[in-house]
């Protein structure tokens, strides 16, 4: 099994999560320069802002970086075209099926890596010709399912013949090692990067996170009754 850094051309087998309203071009570039795969979070942007952030990231790093597209975004179609036009190397997706974009992205040489919260979804997406999946457990700060990372990752590893990236509650080398032991090729991290110097959130936000000894992350959820 190849490690994620071998697949992506990065120094470390780590992807920075594409956190909406946080993961700017500057932040993604800083993460890429540090050895991870920086990801621009398109979720809080419009088409023009996304293009500007991609170009800014290119100015700040010569390392690989990617874009995260939330497929429920009203400008998802435009985002899908912009990443092709701007020569983005990796796209991660969430909140929808990327199927209609995969042929265009693959023709442009883009690696396509959807986020999944269940093995059955990973199996379905594998048929589309994607490059890898991010198995994101409920510990994640993002929009996820109900299964914990420790249980989800080996299920997805067993279900698909694709590289699997673990996400959800991963913050240090011990958890990276655990993810590799579960069969993942690397990890995606988000919440733990919020307190980095390069992260653009307010210093009070960072201080609150560092003082939170019980709940370091609070998942974002939408309950349908």
Q: Where do the model's predicted regions map?
A:
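Active-site entrance/lid segments in N-terminal catalytic domains of soluble metabolic enzymes
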Residues: 1-159, 163
């Amino acid at each position: 099994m190849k490690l994620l850094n071998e697949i992506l051309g990065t120094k470390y087998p780590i992807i920075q999560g594409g956190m909406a309203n946080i993961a700017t071009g500057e932040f993604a570039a800083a993460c890429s320069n540090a050895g991870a795969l920086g990801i621009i979070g398109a979720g809080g942007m419009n088409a023009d802002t996304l293009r500007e952030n991609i170009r800014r990231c290119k100015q700040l790093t010569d390392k690989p970086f990617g874009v995260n597209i939330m497929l429920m975004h009203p400008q998802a179609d435009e985002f899908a075209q912009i990443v092709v036009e701007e020569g983005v190397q990796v796209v991660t997706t969430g909140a929808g099926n990327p199927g209609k974009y995969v042929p265009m992205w693959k023709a442009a040489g883009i690696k396509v890596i959807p986020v999944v919260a269940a093995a059955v979804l990973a199996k379905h997406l594998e048929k589309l010709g994607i490059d890898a999946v991010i198995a994101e457990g409920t510990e994640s700060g993002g929009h996820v399912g109900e299964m914990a990372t420790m249980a989800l990752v080996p299920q997805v590893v067993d279900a698909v013949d694709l590289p699997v990236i673990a996400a959800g509650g991963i913050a240090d080398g011990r958890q990276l090692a655990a993810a590799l032991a579960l069969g993942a090729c690397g990890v995606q991290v988000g919440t733990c990067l919020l307190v980095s110097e390069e992260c653009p959130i307010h210093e009070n936000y960072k201080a609150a996170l560092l003082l939170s000894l019980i709940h370091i992350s609070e998942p974002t959820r939408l309950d349908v009754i």
